[in-house]
Amino acid sequence: MQLVVCGVLGLVLGLYAFTLPECPLSQSNDKRNLAQRLGLDAFVLFKSKTMAMFFIFSMLLGVSLQITNGFATPYIESFSAVSDSWFANNPTMLVSLSQISEALCILLTSFFLIRFGIKKVMLIAMFAWVLRFGFFGVGDTETIWGIAALILSCIVYGVAFDFFNVSGAMFVQQEAPQSMQGSAQGLFMLMTNGIGASVGTYIAGKVVDHFCTWEAGHLVSRAEFANGWQSTWFIFAGYALVVAVMFMILFRYKHDRSKMENMTH
């Protein structure tokens, strides 16, 4: 049923797109070379220490993003194997909380970015990742506190995702030259959803395979289930905490509130 609803909504949105006003591409007389056409010119941004550090930590945060993309839903769904509670048998509800939180928190990103600057906003996102993984580590579907931890983890996901992805894209738009805006955004996506996601998939997979042996059909007790996932999520939380502390120490940027307020996006 869910796939049918998604298909119908996709068709409706596709038809709606035909009613939108035409937005012709701007005509430029500049002749771009092959490197510019491929977006490779954005790599010159690494000459700036601030931008280089930003992109490196974007990659490290991309690892956290891939961890939750790859294993948050399987983790929540796996409770049904060891629990008969309502939450264990309705994992979609918990997963949907993350999506709702993401949709609501996106409204806050501009305000926080203008008021506090990219460093503080990204630090908020990083510590939100720590809480996201930490709450998963102590969560369960049998106790009130465990259920509350799972709910809080799903709620804090909106902050973790939006305060990094959305504010990061806005920061790149602010700092990159006008001539390479598109290339710079592509580089940001490469570092997060490309390199970061690939590294995150590999490392997270190794950690889960090591601690969650029942994934291969060897689950023997509820305790093994809990201990395996708990160790896994605490390792991920520790990783996110180390990244946050390193970012706090290494990233240097003086926030210009007026510059951010005047930015068009």
Model-derived regions: residue spans:
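C-terminal ends and interior cores of transmembrane alpha-helices
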Residues: F127-T143
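Juxtamembrane intracellular "pre-TM" segments in multi-pass secondary transporters
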Residues: P21-F54, A81-V82
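Intracellular juxtamembrane helix-capping segments at the cytosolic ends
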Residues: F163-P177
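Pair of pore-lining "gating" transmembrane helices in MFS-fold secondary transporters
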Residues: K47-T68, I155
